[in-house]
Amino acid sequence: MKDLLRQENNEVADITIIGAGPIGLYAAFYAGLRTMKARVVDSLPQIGGQLTALYPKKAIYDVAGYPKIVAEALIANLAIQASQYHPEILTSTQITEIHRNGALFELFSEDGRQFLSKTVLIAAGVGAFAPRKLPMEEAVKWEGNGLFYFVQDPTVFFGKKVLIIGGGDSALDWAMALMANAEVTLIHRRDKFTAHEDSVEKVRKSPANIKTFYELKSIVGKDSPQGKELHKVVIFNNKTNEETTLEVDAILCNLGFSTNLGPIKNWGVEILNNAVKVDVNMATNVTGIYAAGDIVWHPAKLKLIATGFAEAAIAINNAKTIVEPHANFFPGHSSSSKEKK
């Protein structure tokens, strides 16, 4: 992936893609298919978005062609796919302003750099993100010392008694991923899960201990040669107030993320439901600015990597007709275009 990173230049890009997550990387590849000069910028220090920053070792099951693929491997494959067209990719670069200047867009970064582009694609995922944390004052002192909000290295949990908190995809996916090498207890404050039905069914049939209507009340530590370490937790049933004490070595909280669109709200694009509103062409209300992936809202929106790929292709094909007004919207199939080269 290091070979993909390049220094910025002063050339006008046909399209500037804001976000180097899976959708942004696929958009860079697809722009190459349409012979568009692409620039990709991301505020994070590495490509991959949330997949790299939060759960590089997490298995993903709903990407076409892969029965199962680890997040960092998916990003590596997307980087290789995009690299054949040599897009300019700039990490640690946060775009704060976008202004129209004649036929071009001027994009300004937080550190004052200027970039020129004929079109723009916003593929910034959920914007700025941070994990929702436990609403307990005592939880702060355990962060990184037995209490985790995301998983960089799953082997940290191997051979341990792990309490997982949450009812979404991440919570159940990690329960399935860890149960072969750890003793897993999963608690959720309701009996309805927001995860995929298949994941819920698999976890219910697994050796994992599932407790619904339970929440965390307190964390108990003990002294060790290395200092204070996590020892027990007290959980309670939110219907009966019955308390239960569990011995645990680690807590993994998957309570979702707090998101913030940040400067995107000031770019003139219409915002709806804390997302960028687009039409069927993935176009925003600003001509020449498109959006794709989790950052967008439209009536049929599904927040999946699979649908994000399709949205990126739609956006790029439409942007091509702005860069080259006489170009066809539909370029034909990639197999045909490759064979002609």
Swiss-Prot record:
Subunit structure: Homodimer.
The protein's name: Ferredoxin--NADP reductase 2
InterPro entries from the UniProt entry: FAD/NAD-bd_sf, FAD/NAD-binding_dom, Fd--NADP_Rdtase_type_2, Ferredoxin-NADP_redctase_2
Record: residues binding FAD: D42, Q50, Y55, I95, F129, D294, S335
Source taxonomy: Bacteria, Pseudomonadati, Chlorobiota, Chlorobiia, Chlorobiales
Pfam families listed in its UniProt record: Pyr_redox_2
Cofactor note: Binds 1 FAD per subunit.
Root EC class: oxidoreductase
